[in-house]
Design a protein with these regions (language model features):
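Short acidic DE-rich linear segments
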Residues: 87-96
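Charge-rich, solvent-exposed alpha-helical interaction surfaces
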Residues: 9-13, 75-82
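Negatively charged, low-complexity tracts enriched in Asp/Glu with abundant Ser/Thr
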Residues: 1-24
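Acidic, low-complexity, intrinsically disordered interaction modules
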Residues: 19-78
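Short, surface-exposed acidic
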Residues: 19-20, 83-86
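A sequence-composition feature that detects small, non-aromatic residues
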Residues: 9, 28-31, 84
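Residue-identity detector for threonine
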Residues: 3, 64-67, 86
Length: 96
């Protein structure tokens, strides 16, 4: 199975990344597809298998949006990909 980072995984599913947040232990993105805006989030990267979800949103500032869908990894798996996202190593105060 081929590996992709979080941002490239979203693009591989046919979305255009509009806004990307690269946090210490998480990543999130707003992306569009077929005139619909979506919010993607990969949870705590300190975990061996972090949780990935997406939901429909109304704007690039809508962090509450609709219901979470956890089908991102399954859709990628069907295409022969999996997400491998490394944490920031420098200044990661949560890892002490």
């Amino acid at each position: 199975m081929k590996t992709l980072n979080f941002k490239h995984a979203i693009e591989k599913l046919g979305y255009k990344v509009e806004k990307y947040v690269y946090g210490y232990n998480f990543r999130s993105a707003f992306a569009s597809k077929d005139n619909q805006l979506w919010y993607f989030h990969i949870e705590d990267l300190r975990d061996e298998h972090p949780f990935v979800y997406r939901r429909k949103v109304k704007s690039l500032e809508d962090y509450t949006g609709g219901s979470n869908n956890n089908d991102v990894e399954l859709k990628l798996e069907q295409l022969g990909y999996k997400i491998v996202e490394k944490r920031k190593q420098k200044y990661d105060f949560n890892s002490f």
